[in-house]
């Protein structure tokens, strides 16, 4: 089922959906559709992911046999959507670093900075400097976990914004920004 959606085989995915509907296994349908939507389609078509969640909700509300219709719509949408695993790859990369290292959150990002000069504290009212602040610990400051997949117009726009943001020099010297 999931592999059929990942492989963009609409007919196979609908066939396997039919098998699960015949078994009246809405829990498995829901779990598998949600996992596939977020894992395989993801940022390739986030609107399709949202529509999938809505379709599952509608199917659960109306029950079978009518619930098959929104589920079929979701499957067709997911099968024919551009695919992107960039979000999964990004969190996996971050968690891999986390498993092998342990770096402290910078003091200025902590909820209540103790014994910190006011000019060294994070300024919640200065949205003009937020993208200039270094948020990763010093040892990871140049680490890039997210790498866009250019399979969809949506993720291409994200990639363009990311490129602009990565050109901005980030600093942990907050006093210099004020």
Residue ranges and their predicted role:
Residues 1-7:
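A short helix-loop-helix "switch/interaction" segment in the helical subdomain of ASCE P-loop NTPases
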Residues 7-130, 137-178:
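Terminal-proximal interaction/regulatory segments of ATP-powered molecular machines
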